[in-house]
């Protein structure tokens, strides 16, 4: 499984979640831009990705159009207003929120 991690703080205070994913053989792709990604940057990063651990980056219809393998978006933070949830639902992409993580 290929996981895009856009949040720069994910795993910063506790490495256990990252370690668990690596132990399962998952490929973790960290945010190489080190800032909240623009729509264009997200469009470049999502092809071939199965899951996104999402910070404040925007997941629009245009981003989802490029996400050919995406199955789940897990919002690492508060709220999901940065995700086109209606479009994700149409495509059968699950959207979750990780509570109490910030």
Residue positions per predicted region:
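N-terminal glycine-/charge-rich "phosphate-binding" loop or analogous flexible N-terminal tail
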Residues: 1-49
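Phosphate/diphosphate ligand-binding glycine-rich loop within oxidoreductases
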Residues: 50-102
């Amino acid at each position: 499984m290929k996981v895009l991690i856009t949040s720069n703080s994910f795993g910063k205070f506790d490495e256990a979640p990252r370690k668990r994913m690596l132990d399962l053989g998952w490929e973790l792709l960290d945010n190489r831009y080190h800032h909240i990604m623009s729509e264009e940057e997200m469009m470049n990063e999502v092809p071939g990705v199965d899951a996104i651990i999402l910070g404040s980056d925007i997941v629009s219809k245009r981003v989802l159009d490029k996400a050919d393998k995406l199955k789940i978006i897990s919002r690492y933070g508060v709220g999901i207003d940065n995700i086109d949830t209606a479009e994700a639902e149409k495509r059968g992409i699950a959207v979750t929120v990780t509570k109490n993580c910030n």
